[in-house]
Amino acid sequence: MVKVLVLYYSAYGHMEKMAKAAAEGAREGGAEVTIKRVPELVPPDVAKASHYKIDQDAPIATPAELADYDAIIIGTATRYGMMAAQMKNFLDQTGGLWAKGALINKVGSVMVSTATQHGGAELALISTQWQMQHQGMIIVPLSYAYQGQMGNDVVRGGAPYGMTTTADGDGSRQPSEQELDGARFQGKRVAEITAKLNS
């Protein structure tokens, strides 16, 4: 059984929900799944005043443990078209893993949330994949195999590079059932492809 880590950063709970959905999909795909989050960098008083969701139940990950998994699905909020600083700070601490080649041939996949529909989701997906590629990871995107992203009748998450969700500037929009379904699809796809690569 392959081991999948869903590693996320979520200030307001949107990516937390997406991470849990991706984990459901990966389990359905036959994987042993762990959900963890990266440390918060915002001071606690500022996070509280900004109404961050501080009651998230996922434990905090450490960079060294990434090597323990066959696949890593990263979920991150987007800031100005890039991954959130909290995720970047965490990934920037993986130089030791890079030096040892510890993540070479492991599977990587990415999901993001943005405040607006055109808030840099695709750029954040791709730039996060770049970090994985520097580690020698094999990228498994959402792809157009997930048909739920097609259509313009409503706001829909998804891109060929990875699943997305839109939160609105005030965080009022929660991930839709279509977006959660896409996260589950991506998680299952990662688990199944990882199993094939490890057989």
From Swiss-Prot:
Pfam families: FMN_red (PF03358). GO terms for molecular function: flavin adenine dinucleotide binding; FMN binding; NAD binding; NADH:ubiquinone reductase (non-electrogenic) activity; NADP binding; NADPH dehydrogenase (quinone) activity. NAD(+) binds at residue 12. Gene3D superfamilies: 3.40.50.360. Its EC number is 1.6.5.2. GO terms for cellular component: membrane. Its cofactor is FMN. SUPFAM superfamilies: Flavoproteins. FMN binds at residues 10-15, 78-80, 113-119, 134. Binds 1 FMN per monomer. Residues 157-185 are annotated as: Disordered. Substrate binds at residue 98. Keywords: Flavoprotein, FMN, NAD, NADP, Nucleotide-binding, Oxidoreductase. InterPro entries: Flavodoxin/NO_synth, Flavoprotein-like_sf, Flavoprotein_WrbA-like, FMN_Rdtase-like_dom, NQO. Residues 163-177 have a biased composition (Polar residues). Belongs to the WrbA family. PANTHER family: FLAVODOXIN-RELATED PROTEIN WRBA-RELATED, FLAVOPROTEIN-LIKE PROTEIN YCP4-RELATED. HAMAP family: NQOR (MF_01017). This is NAD(P)H dehydrogenase (quinone). It comes from Brucella anthropi (strain ATCC 49188 / DSM 6882 / CCUG 24695 / JCM 21032 / LMG 3331 / NBRC 15819 / NCTC 12168 / Alc 37) (Ochrobactrum anthropi).
